[in-house]
Amino acid sequence: MAFKVGCDNFSSSNFSTQVVCSPSGAALFCFEVLFSSTTGSSVDSESLERLFDGVAILLLLILLSLSNYYSIQLSNSYVLKYRVYTIKSHLIAKANIEKKKKKKKKKQIKNFQFG
């Protein structure tokens, strides 16, 4: 499912893509939200709208920093990872909403000695 509002639509064959622009509809500030087909996770559109209201403001503030890759923890189980780059003079924020991987506890190996 893909849609665009005043900005170019970039998609990847590995992901289903939604492109959401800033509330002003400015073509220079777009989000590309990628949902990995392997995780099977889904996020409803109302949650996305609330998410992007906050992320749009946050991105505008962060864009001035030197780094171009960021991560925001959404909840205990989801993380929003995004990076900022330019294509054809369009400023693009590419984001993945990922399910956090549970850390596996290492099993303690007990050594038994006979004899």
From Swiss-Prot:
Q: Which domain of life is it from?
A: Eukaryota
GO-annotated cellular components = membrane
Keywords of the record: Membrane, Transmembrane, Transmembrane helix
Q: Where in the cell is it found?
A: Membrane
Anything else the record notes?
A: Partially overlaps HAS1.
Q: Where are the transmembrane segments?
A: 15-35, 52-72
Principal location: membrane
Its taxonomic placement starts with:
Eukaryota, Fungi, Dikarya, Ascomycota, Saccharomycotina
Source species: Saccharomyces cerevisiae (strain ATCC 204508 / S288c)
Name of the protein in its database record: Putative uncharacterized membrane protein YMR290W-A
Specify the protein's topology with respect to the membrane. Multi-pass membrane protein
